[in-house]
């Protein structure tokens, strides 16, 4: 049956999000049965998703959703920044984080099993999107936090932060989250810096101080001072507040009667080794699917 109406093709496109020619081909193969065509395209989409699963997905977005004392952050990856900026991809990420929050998901498996607003699971929508867009799409990381006061900040879809406070208000928590996005502290307070990190820095500072040729007692004071400065630089509370460098973050929250309990910061593609390909190779790869 090759006489497939444009109306039928349009309906299948709206249901699957696939291209016109792909929809027409599926309808021809299904002898005009739209239900059968949609099912076959779903199976085909699964096959495409499996085929693309091994491809490196290092671009993408961070999405955050906070409500009812709980916050969740998701990193959802694509292969290219072009797809990461696509409205369909961004809508999927937004739907996924809302579904995950509603399901109180704490693992990747729980996120993928969460139901979206249209009744499909995140995993089902993900695989459909792979078939439509033609790239490997992965839900890579999920982080959750619970606190009395939560503030979220997203920078350019690439950095997402949630600050968790005791006391204070959402505006204060958002300011702290924005600071964390900009300053990238290692820990909340200096006493949380791992001992091996402090020991390594002390070793470096000691070698530098000895080169000064000063007396041992002076060298010891120099080392103590440099360690203190290092801890202030890597710990959130010791850092100068980005919106007002005249005050420390510790004073900012203390003056509001609050305390920073925790923060979570995610960067897109953090820790992923990107595969280097030239532009021509990338184009050929996409043409071949």
UniProtKB/Swiss-Prot annotation:
PROSITE patterns: EF_TS_1, EF_TS_2. GO terms for cellular component: cytoplasm. Keywords: Cytoplasm, Elongation factor, Protein biosynthesis. The gene is tsf. It comes from Francisella tularensis subsp. tularensis (strain SCHU S4 / Schu 4). Pfam families: EF_TS (PF00889). Signal peptide: none annotated. Residues 80-83 are annotated as: Involved in Mg(2+) ion dislocation from EF-Tu. Associates with the EF-Tu.GDP complex and induces the exchange of GDP to GTP. It remains bound to the aminoacyl-tRNA.EF-Tu.GTP complex up to the GTP hydrolysis stage on the ribosome. It comes from the Bacteria. InterPro entries: EF-Ts_dimer_sf, Transl_elong_EFTs/EF1B, Transl_elong_EFTs/EF1B_dimer, Transl_elong_Ts_CS, UBA-like_sf. Disulfide bonds: none annotated. SUPFAM superfamilies: Elongation factor Ts (EF-Ts), dimerisation domain, UBA-like. Belongs to the EF-Ts family. It is found in: Cytoplasm. This is Elongation factor Ts.
């Amino acid at each position: 049956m090759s006489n497939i109406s444009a109306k039928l093709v349009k309906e299948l496109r709206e249901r699957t999000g696939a291209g016109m020619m792909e929809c027409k081909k599926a309808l021809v193969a299904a002898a005009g049965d739209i239900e059968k065509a949609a099912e076959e395209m779903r199976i085909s989409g699964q096959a495409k998703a499996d085929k693309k699963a091994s491809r490196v997905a290092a671009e993408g977005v961070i999405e955050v959703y906070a409500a009812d004392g709980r916050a969740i952050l998701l990193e959802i990856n694509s292969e290219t920044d072009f797809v990461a900026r696509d409205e369909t991809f961004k809508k999927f990420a937004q739907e996924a984080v809302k579904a995950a929050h509603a399901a109180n998901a704490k693992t990747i498996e729980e996120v993928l099993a969460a139901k979206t607003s249209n009744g499909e699971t995140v995993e089902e929508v993900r695989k459909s999107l792979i078939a439509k867009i033609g790239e490997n799409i992965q839900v890579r990381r999920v982080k959750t936090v619970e606190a009395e006061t939560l503030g979220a900040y997203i920078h350019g879809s690439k950095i997402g932060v949630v600050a968790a406070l005791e006391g204070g208000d959402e505006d204060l928590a958002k300011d702290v989250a924005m600071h964390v996005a900009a300053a990238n502290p290692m820990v909340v307070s200096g006493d949380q810096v791992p001992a091996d990190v402090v020991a390594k820095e002390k070793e470096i500072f000691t070698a530098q101080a000895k080169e000064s040729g000063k007396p041992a007692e002076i060298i010891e004071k120099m080392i103590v001072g440099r360690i203190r400065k290092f801890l202030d630089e890597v710990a959130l509370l010791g850092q100068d507040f980005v919106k007002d460098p005249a005050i420390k973050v510790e004073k900012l929250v203390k003056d509001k009667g609050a305390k920073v309990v925790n923060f979570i910061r995610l960067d897109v593609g953090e820790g992923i080794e990107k595969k280097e390909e030239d532009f021509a190779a990338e184009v050929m790869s996409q043409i071949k699917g």
